[in-house]
């Protein structure tokens, strides 16, 4: 598959965050590839960009699918509960 058409999942996390672990477990269960970005490793400028990209939210996790801000852990699980997550993930690269 051409890399330029790959869809992407990015999750901003902190290692000790239980909600981050829960969100990653759901993505792992869905067998999709995602990029994890540890917020504590970001520079101040990168943190400011992350907060802006997240609509002013600085909490973690913050999840993006194809550059669309999904939100946090509860938002991800709500998409799953509503049956909408699989549709968002259907074109994602699989593990």
Swiss-Prot record:
GO terms for biological process: cell redox homeostasis. Monomer. CDD domains: GRX_GRXb_1_3_like. It comes from Rickettsia prowazekii (strain Madrid E). InterPro entries: GLR_AS, Glutaredoxin, Glutaredoxin_subgr, GRX_bact, Thioredoxin-like_sf. Has a glutathione-disulfide oxidoreductase activity in the presence of NADPH and glutathione reductase. Reduces low molecular weight disulfides and proteins. It holds the Pfam family Glutaredoxin. It is found in: Cytoplasm. GO terms for cellular component: cytoplasm. Its main location: cytoplasm. Keywords: Cytoplasm, Disulfide bond, Electron transport, Redox-active center, Transport. This is Glutaredoxin 1. GO terms for molecular function: protein-disulfide reductase activity. Residues 1-95 form the Glutaredoxin domain. Belongs to the glutaredoxin family. Disulfide bonds join 17-20.
